[in-house]
Amino acid sequence: RPNLGNPIPLVKETLLKLYENHPGLQIASVTTTGYGEELVKNAFHCDRGLVETVAHFTAAKHFLPDVDFIIDIGGQDMKCFKIEDGAISNIFLNEACSSGCGSFLQTFAQALGYNVKEFAALGLFADKPVDLGSRCTVFMNSSVKQAQKDGASIENISAGLSISVVKNALYKVIRASSPEELGRNIVVQGGTFYNEAVLRAFEKEMGVN
């Protein structure tokens, strides 16, 4: 959920729900990470903060010890980590443009009259995803409008945008010449991958499932 520049109320709401759903719960220790790391840590007197890259790697390694590559796509940015010999060997970040991130999809969903969850679900029913390339939001907007004029369905536009997100990550941020360069054991993270159409587009591009 967007925090509108102030994550404190959202964190408070989440904690209250946690206690409500688990009466008697006692939290032994709390670590914060991400953009609001210090702010949230100080506001809620958390035990410590952890650099975001270390948090991503630690979580990925916990669930997949032999992880080769981590892709994190959030609302505003994208981070990718190459793992070699059990350590991060390279980090790839997207440029200032938020094209290919969660806010990118949300912008188009709202412009077309949907919330992002509905818009993502429609993409799973595409029969001919629109080829929108992997350009920035401004140019992509004109491509979407042209696709609408050409009679493309919302399903095919949604799927096309999801494919653009994936291709932007693989071929512009990581600059891979082929999906195989990422390795065999890949972990995806970040809220954008809750978009089932993006996850499916990634699986298809990687040649799995």
Regions found by a protein language model. Name each.
Residues 1-9, 13-17, 90-91, 95-97:
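Short glycine-rich, Thr/Ser-proximal phosphate-binding strand/loop in the N-terminal lobe
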Residues 2-4, 19-53, 82, 89-90:
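Short beta-strand-loop/turn "lid" adjacent to the catalytic site in phosphate-handling enzymes
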Residues 35-36, 164, 177-205:
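Glycine-rich phosphate-binding loops at beta-strand->alpha-helix junctions
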Residues 14-28, 169-183:
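Phosphate/pyrophosphate-binding loops at sites that engage ATP/ADP/AMP, CoA/4′-phosphopantetheine
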Residues 85-128:
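Glycine-rich phosphate-binding loop plus the immediately following alpha-helix
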Residues 142-171:
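Adenine-nucleotide phosphate-binding core of ATP-dependent small-molecule kinases
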Residues 67-84:
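Gly/Thr-rich phosphate-binding beta-strand-loop-beta motif of the actin/hexokinase/Hsp70
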Residues 27-31, 66-71:
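Short glycine-aspartate micro-motif
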